[in-house]
Amino acid sequence: MNLANYFPVLLFILVGIGVGLVPMFLGKILAPSKPDAEKLSPYECGFEAFEDARMKFDVRYYLIAILFILFDLETAFLFPWGVALRDIGWLGYASMVIFLLEFIVGFVYIWKKGALDWE
């Protein structure tokens, strides 16, 4: 195994790390730093913070987010299938129909359970 073949990869990694770290270190070294109480205080639209930034979210938001990701991934699988539909034949068509039927059954189950209701 010749390690010289991996030199471009090593160079790419080092340049990538350098592009990320060099501006940070230059900013730390060259930027003027005069911290005071006003600069270190939290900023909220020009006003003092009214309350703690950590608020409790309703669990329904998380449920909707998970469902969105799930159905978004479904569409991510649909695009390549639509492009390659002529090449994959009936087996690919049938497998995608089964895949979509599983998602439809899941969607109906979620709907019947009331996961999409905001009451």
From Swiss-Prot:
Q: Keywords for this entry?
A: Cell inner membrane, Cell membrane, Membrane, NAD, Quinone, Translocase, Transmembrane, Transmembrane helix, Transport, Ubiquinone
InterPro entries named in the record = NAD(P)H_OxRDtase_bac/plastid, NADH_UbQ/plastoQ_OxRdtase_su3, NDAH_ubi_oxred_su3_sf
Cellular compartment(s) = Cell inner membrane
What is the topology of this protein in the membrane according to its UniProt annotation?
Answer: Multi-pass membrane protein
Q: What is its main location?
A: membrane
| GO CC list | NADH dehydrogenase complex; plasma membrane
Name the catalysed reactions.
a quinone + NADH + 5 H(+)(in) = a quinol + NAD(+) + 4 H(+)(out)
- Transmembrane region positions? 7-27, 63-83, 88-108
A UniProt-annotated Pfam family: Oxidored_q4
Which EC class is the enzyme in? translocase
The EC code for this enzyme is 7.1.1.-
Keyword Transferase on this protein?
Answer: no
Q: Which GO terms describe its molecular function?
A: NADH dehydrogenase (ubiquinone) activity; NADH:ubiquinone reductase (non-electrogenic) activity; quinone binding
Q: How does it assemble?
A: NDH-1 is composed of 14 different subunits. Subunits NuoA, H, J, K, L, M, N constitute the membrane sector of the complex.
| Family per similarity comment | Belongs to the complex I subunit 3 family.
Classification via PANTHER family: NADH-UBIQUINONE OXIDOREDUCTASE CHAIN 3 (PTHR11058:SF9)
Entry function: NDH-1 shuttles electrons from NADH, via FMN and iron-sulfur (Fe-S) centers, to quinones in the respiratory chain. The immediate electron acceptor for the enzyme in this species is believed to be ubiquinone. Couples the redox reaction to proton translocation (for every two electrons transferred, four hydrogen ions are translocated across the cytoplasmic membrane), and thus conserves the redox energy in a proton gradient.
Under which name does UniProt file this protein? NADH-quinone oxidoreductase subunit A
**Whose protein is this, by species?**
Polynucleobacter necessarius subsp. necessarius (strain STIR1)
